[in-house]
């Protein structure tokens, strides 16, 4: 299954200088539990915004147009087109999580079957927004879980799960 997973603020902001403008340990735990032992796909800028840190327990694919781009980490696969990613994915027995950034989510929109969308109930300053052209009408909201702020999480947020609507 191909799954989108991301967090955004109330205005759809997903990043500031290729990083997330908030830190929410409970949301990070949700991401970890949801993607563990699966494949995550992100763009080069998102990967570099994480200081090229590889998330343990997952296969990481970095999508870049730069044909010369390399990673020092053997657990990172570098690919150069959506077709290359999909050809590789169809030979696997794992889910593929599209984690961002905005360009990568937009590239794979038509392939997405399930969405995990975290909405942080605040407005931040940043430079990258979730694609405004994304068609949520193709999906049905199936669950929401609200998280209140606490000593570890400075903001309230809601994790929303959507399933692709089956066409008759």
From Swiss-Prot:
Residues bound to NADP(+): 6-7, 14-19, 43-46, 63-66, 99-104
User: What protein am I looking at?
Assistant: Dihydrofolate reductase
Name of the gene this protein is made from? folA
Catalysed reaction, written as an equation: (6S)-5,6,7,8-tetrahydrofolate + NADP(+) = 7,8-dihydrofolate + NADPH + H(+)
Q: What class of enzyme is it?
A: oxidoreductase
Which residue range or ranges hold the DHFR domain? 1-164
Q: Which organism is it from?
A: Lactococcus lactis subsp. lactis (strain IL1403) (Streptococcus lactis)
The protein's job, in short, is:
Key enzyme in folate metabolism. Catalyzes an essential reaction for de novo glycine and purine synthesis, and for DNA precursor synthesis.
Per the record's keyword annotation, is NADP included, yes or no? yes
Membrane-spanning ranges? none
Involved pathway(s):
Cofactor biosynthesis; tetrahydrofolate biosynthesis; 5,6,7,8-tetrahydrofolate from 7,8-dihydrofolate: step 1/1
């Amino acid at each position: 299954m191909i799954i989108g997973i991301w967090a955004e603020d109330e205005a759809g902001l997903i990043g500031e200088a290729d990083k997330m403008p908030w830190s929410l340990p409970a949301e990070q735990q949700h991401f970890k539990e949801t993607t563990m032992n699966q494949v995550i796909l992100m763009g080069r800028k998102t990967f570099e915004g994480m200081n090229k840190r590889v998330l343990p327990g997952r296969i990481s694919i970095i999508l870049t147009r730069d044909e010369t781009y390399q990673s020092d980490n053997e657990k990172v696969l570098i690919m150069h087109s959506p077709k290359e990613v999909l050809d590789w994915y169809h030979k696997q027995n794992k889910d593929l999580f599209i984690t961002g950034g905005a360009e990568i989510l937009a590239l794979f929109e038509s392939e997405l079957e399930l969405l995990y969308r975290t909405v942080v109930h605040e407005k931040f300053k940043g430079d990258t927004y979730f694609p405004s052209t994304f068609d949520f009408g193709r999906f049905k909201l199936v669950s929401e879980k609200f998280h209140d702020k606490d000593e570890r999480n400075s903001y309230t947020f809601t994790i929303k799960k959507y399933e692709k609507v089956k066409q008759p």
